[in-house]
Amino acid sequence: MKQFFLLVCLCLWACIATAQSQDTPLNGKKIENEKPPIALYKFISHQRDTTYLDTTLTIQKSYKFNYLRSDTFELLPFSNVGQTYNGLAINTTSKRLTPLFAAQSHHYNYKEIEDVSYFNVPTPLTEIYFKTAFEQGQQLNAFFTINTSKQFNFSLSYQGVRSLGNYQQSLTSTGNLLITSNYFSKNNRYNVRFHVASHDILNRENGGLTQNSLALFINDDPEFSDRGRLDVNFEDAENNLKGVRFYMSQEYSLLQKADSTSTTALTLGNSIWYEEKLFEYRQNTAYEPYGASYEPVDLYNKTTLEDFNIQAYARLENTLLGNFKVFTTLTDYNYGYNSVLNLDNGQIPNRIKDNMVSVGGAYQKQYKGFDLAAQAAINVSGATTGNYINAAAGYSLNEDTRVQGSIKIHNVAPNFNFQLYQSDYVNYNWKTEFNTIKTQELGFDLWSKKVANLSLSYTGIDDYTYFAINPSQSQEDTFLRPTPQQFTSRVNYLKIKAEREFNWRGFALNNTIMYQNVLSGSTVFNVPELITRQSLYYQDQIFKNALFFQTGVNLKYFTKYNSNGYDPVLAEFYVQNEQEIGGFPVIDLFFNAKIRQTRIFVTWEHFNALFSKTNQYFSAPGYP
């Protein structure tokens, strides 16, 4: 607490000192209403791509005004803000050499290293995001950044969410803290970046509605219009995902491009990061449908991961040859539990450990109008198998049209909780020996102002892993639970997405349509065939152009499909082919406004629910 108080005091002192130096120029005369150009407010991504502060109001900003601060077109949210999302589409990762941690359904709001940005601003910059939540709750994101000098920037952001929810035992609580800093030497030869990220994502779990409550909900019984009166399967469970990460990256330019005639630059760098993750599941009393338990009361599962990485790299930039990067990474991870589990038919270990070395490279070049890029990496030592190759070529046909083709090949071990899991529930304990997941993807993208933005991908997956109800369980076994499984055949998956906006005077119609087809493996790979979103709105300026507004209606629809089910013990989704969801539109009414740099969003969500005679909208089986 003392350190945090000192940090806040230093920030306030820096704000005051910077404000004084900016308000009073060297000649002693105060300059009124002088504002730096917006292009001086720079946002720098992990990949060192630079964007600028954007205070405009667009329909895309409305799509991103949510808990994740991103467009959720391919996601289906649960009933309460801060809960998980069911995926309407599958996006395969392509640059990962190690397995992922447990509880992936709760990682949507977990900032990984690639999600962290750094900043460079001429004056202190603050952004406050506030949005109401369900039943005694609020969402708040607070962001502050300042340059104490031209070379050093510091930023602090915090996301806090607490929402009781409309259904019993669905409270959510999120507290995510991110601190970043970056420094450039005056000659721009040396640069260092640092961040600390802390996550605390709590969800109380209820197991979904009981069968009787599901019938009352579907029939829209007026006595249960207050959703809090519907019974849930249990009222005494919660899970919690926590994580903390320390990251530092620095580089030094041995050779610099001094001017436009220089042809070569050489940079050496290294990165080091350490991360701890913790997933906990608590339940006061064992829930019978999950099967027998080692403890009848006060059930508690704790899964941990310690992940340490050191990377060294060299980057060569040459006007003629292109940009090259080579790197090597040392990784040491330790996943698991505190004790070994001894069973009648064997033993379940408590740890998965490895110390591995990977090497890789990247290349980028502009050649005769083509933008060429490639990345590759492979684990060369250690027990963990993993590699990837990504390549892309883009070409601008004209100022309005650009095309790109890509290929991705990725092999990686299944997530840790597919390999090893321990729980106080007897049925939730396993140690598996699965094959490496092998993914190949061909992609094509078109960006055209006159036609549409189009993306097409064809993905093939061998040894696809998933959670599902074991089909070998007897019909007399009422304790059906998801277990890790690996598909012995190949999954082939086609996805086509198109976006286009039509404008006429002050009216606009924004369209997003996605078509999906699982050509093989549809029994284990559940996605809707069609997803569509249309936004019809009107925009204009009023009050002598002091206020810019947009008002209209959003419609989102996806076809019926066998949605994945949700398991609160694992905090994972599992494949089920018994119950379909979807086939219903969700219509929102909205009014957005911008006054100077303030943006206001007012939305009446799911407006058409007022006119439904029955309720068929679910986020997952058992979860309205």
Where in the sequence are the language-model features?
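Acidic, small-polar-rich N-terminal luminal/periplasmic segments of exported/outer-membrane proteins
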Residues: 25-122
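Transmembrane beta-barrel wall of Gram-negative outer-membrane proteins
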Residues: 138-160, 169-202, 250
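Long, disordered, Ser/Thr/Pro-rich
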Residues: 156, 292-294
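Flexible loop and strand-edge segments within Gram-negative outer membrane beta-barrel domains
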Residues: 188-249, 277-287, 295-299, 303, ...
